Structure formats: C-alpha cells, structure tokens
Amino acid sequence: MSLLPNRRVLTILLLVLLPSSALAQRAVFVVRHAEKASDSNDPPVPLSAAGSERARRLASLLRDAGVSAIYSTDTVRTRETAAPLAKLLRLETRLYSATGSDGKVDAAPLARRIASENSADVVLVVGHSNTIAPLLSALGAKETVEIGGGDYDNLFLLIPRPSGPPLLLRMHF
C-alpha cells in the first residue's frame, strides 16, 4: 500500500476535517522545498530535475485542495517548489522571511501574517528543513516534528479545531 495521497483522498479529507469557523484558517499545508541541485546552501540553489518533478507532483496533488494563498521564503529552491501550483491556480507567491533580525529562525511573524491575511483560507507554505517545525509550533501544533537533511517528501496538513490544538497530519508525496 502506498503512502502517497491522491487528489481524491486529499479532497475527501479536507471536506470532512475542515472546520467551518472563520476564526482560523481552514487548513495550512507546509512543505519543505523539493530536492535542490547542489548540496550547497549558498544562494542561488535551484531545484534538481527530481526536485522540479516533485514540485509538479505537489501542484497536481493540491490543485483541488482549495489553496488560495501560497507563501515561500525568497530562495530560488522554495520559489521553484511553489511555482507550479501558483501558476496552475493563478496565484502570486507571497514571500516571507524565516528569520528574525538576530538571524535565528522566527516563525511567529509568519503565523501572525497567515492568520491576519488568510483567516478562512487554505494556505500552502514552502519552507526549509529548519523552519518547518518552528512554523508548525507557531501555528499551534503540539507534536514534535523532525525533518532530516535528505527528507523532501513530507507534506504536513494542519487543521484548526474549535477547541484544543490543531490536528496535524503528516503525509508523504
């Protein structure tokens, strides 16, 4: 049995699990950028051929999920990961900084921005291995998430609930 979610399963999950309250996002998808062409982190680092293919699969997977906003850090690899879905949905990718003025990862500003700009939307955030866990935590997830250096296939779905912490689903694509 494959762990790969298909669009029909994802659509059913969204319809069944999404809250109708306008007090929070309907859902937030969070992914790490797809495979990069180099092991270097010095910009600009584009996606590899495998990474470009994964970005296209992500677009195919989320095309019917109701995504109405896409956020990405301002690196080539994250923007290239977001690009196929943004193009398909005719959305402009919104850039965000994953670090505070001290250079350390700070996800709280993005969490506040998502809440204020997209109160009733389904959102996709494309980040990095070191920014995903802090973002999920800033969005209220209680589970501890670790992303390995070679892990590019995680797709997190955070669904707010009327009370208590949000539901966090971890899938692979």
Each predicted region: which residue ranges?
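Hydrophobic alpha-helical segments, principally membrane-spanning helices and signal/leader peptides
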Residues: L4-P5, L17-L18, T75, R113
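Bacterial N-terminal signal peptides
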Residues: T11-S20
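Bacterial N-terminal signal peptides that target proteins for export
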Residues: M1-T11
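Conserved beta-strand position immediately N-terminal to the Walker
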Residues: V123
